[in-house]
């Protein structure tokens, strides 16, 4: 894969992931405001964004077998707890 393609897919994955969570947050607000149809619409859009993001992630070759996926999850969560958030706290 060309470097520019990889960078574009990575940026698209980040954008789709953020949109997915943003629309779920919007759905939560719509539920709190008793607008179930609007909430349903936001959840449908969130699902579409999730599908887009997963497709980008697959194209990047970042979805592996179960053992590798579990290790990636452990590594990511460990990094957040041991390094990322402590660094944020020290700023």
Task: Label each residue range with its predicted role.
Residues 1-91:
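Non-heme di-metal
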